[in-house]
């Protein structure tokens, strides 16, 4: 699993921290309304309010940065870039705007440009501020994606000491991921344990630790993190079902997941579908994937998962439809898997020109994927 990077909380904090200057009453009211909508994740309404604020006072960087961040959440990257550029034209020292530009580049897979923007944001930000922390996390993520794992470790070193407690769980986890890539199991596990000191009840954290350790070749250590979940006092059918699925004990996974699914848990439907797929119960797997897709049409990961399922079933044309729908959603966290599977689909369909073009585009964004490089060459 590729390292996932959460930005919403940091964006909200950055928007809240921008100082208003020279604004009229109407613009200020629209800005406040926009912030309320943004904090409630109603980005369409937030964008409308921020646009009205900008129209009323086009010389206010806070309004432009807030609009750009909202456009980011709406995946309108060209519009977001324009908003951040306008803010920078007004204030060459606007760290928030440079950070926003970096996020646009990051989501578009333009990592060199992203690093330049984040570096600029860091140089303009307070040494203990959230903009600096957020920008350095992105900078390290760019290094990680491009295969500069030692560089990522060095960048995390700069952040961790001065980071807030709320950030440290994620930062230790991310540095641990980089250590795994450097084949440094000991330091990776030390960082994972430090991460758990700050956040010990997050199931996804254990699963991500399991996945990264397993992918790094440390299978026994990886499974120990999942088994710790089963030792918890709290009995959680969904948690147990997901854990048994990851451990490959599919009969027990079904036992727990079916119970949750019958109680209406949508996440249980997703994991139950994957469990049925692993058990070669394709009829039930297909039914549940379709059900989950119907309820989560904007989840790029499910399009990739279902696309991979269809590839394994030899239904390449159908798989391509779902994979390309997922790509259109523009989710950078899911994009690597989607782009890779798109290229694989073309190859299996014997459309070798399109397969080569797709692998070429993939390798521009993920140049260190040796398996993809081998396919391309």
Give, region by region, the residue ranges found by the protein language model:
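Structural marker of alpha-solenoid helical repeat scaffolds
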Residues: 56, 90, 124-128, 162-164, ...
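TPR alpha-solenoid repeat register
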Residues: 63, 97, 131, 135, ...
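Canonical tetratricopeptide repeat
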Residues: 66, 73, 100, 134-138, ...
